[in-house]
């Protein structure tokens, strides 16, 4: 009967691996809010310095719902990425130079800074734990590698500034930048 146990274990391992892979990939997935806020910040980075844009204009420019975008803009204000100027002629602007605002700043403002991977220490249960072969006194190798990968991801986002993105956009798609500036000057 050992063969049946091994086959059963192998089947569970494959099922676990598929589920775990899906869970890991879904954790790394960012919300559409990140895309929206990066594009909005990039729009302001391409605008003339000191440009104020109302939430409705930003929402219209990007084809986004104003109410939801306004909520995200407030998160950017709270984190010091944007400034909100009240009044009829008020609006939103970048609070710092675009060279000082990173993609990681924006992601953290809208998604938070919590670790992406949360180790549930499943190695403390199941067949290996029951066998006594699992040394839970050592750090979890999965946790170590996932943390290293997350740190590399955060470092890569922290290395990308809005200014760098704006310069790349201007070089690669100058007509998009021109249209953006024309649209802003017309409002």
Language-model features and meaning:
Residues 45-50, 96-97:
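Short helix-capping/hinge SLiMs at alpha-helix to coil transitions
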Residues 2-4, 12-25, 119-187:
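C-terminal regulatory/oligomerization modules of transcriptional regulators
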Residues 22-40:
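Short alpha-helical segments that sit at the start of domains
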Residues 63-83:
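Canonical helix-turn-helix DNA-binding module
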Residues 52-63:
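A short alpha-helical element within helix-turn-helix/winged-helix DNA-binding domains
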Residues 40-47, 109:
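Short amphipathic alpha-helical elements of helix-turn-helix/winged-helix folds
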